[in-house]
Amino acid sequence: MRLNELRDNDGATKIRTRVGRGIGSGKGKTGGRGVKGQKSRSGVAIKGFEGGQMPLHMRLPKRGFNKPNRKAWAEVNLGRLEKAIAEGKIDAKKPIDADVLIAAGLVRRALDGVRLLAKGELKSKVEITLAGASKAAIAAVEKAGGKVTLTAVADDAAE
């Protein structure tokens, strides 16, 4: 077998039908679209329209709601915090707060506050002051000999 003998398997590629190329082609003039009407025009595909039948998105019930005053937390996991300390981006001997995390590039914006989560492992002894933290994250920091201080007064800060 040589490179010039390589070819696709039979049926692997389908030849595109060229429509609107004369009546002799069998797909000329209207190009398989029928005559007149909305669907014969170009650029028409009505998303969600089912020919007058009640569309699926309207047949299904409404569910849930969006909490108007929900907090948007910026989240930091213990594993990323430990990695930043190991890389020298954060000094573990100094207190860590939202500004330190932003400067180190762990968080882009503080939003409604920074929240510490327990994914990963923390080996360094650190003193952290943040708006919120999960119970597992607080336990992990205290197990490593550190301390977590929460600044947010919100009910959902320490869940």
From Swiss-Prot:
Residues 21-35 have a biased composition (Gly residues). Keywords: Ribonucleoprotein, Ribosomal protein, RNA-binding, rRNA-binding. SUPFAM superfamilies: Ribosomal proteins L15p and L18e. Disulfide bonds: none annotated. One of its GO terms (biological process) is translation. Residues 1-13 have a biased composition (Basic and acidic residues). GO terms for cellular component: cytosolic large ribosomal subunit. GO terms for molecular function: rRNA binding; structural constituent of ribosome. InterPro entries: Ribosomal_uL15, Ribosomal_uL15/eL18, Ribosomal_uL15/eL18_sf, Ribosomal_uL15_bac-type, Ribosomal_uL15_CS. Belongs to the universal ribosomal protein uL15 family. Binds to the 23S rRNA. Part of the 50S ribosomal subunit. This is Large ribosomal subunit protein uL15. It comes from Maricaulis maris (strain MCS10).
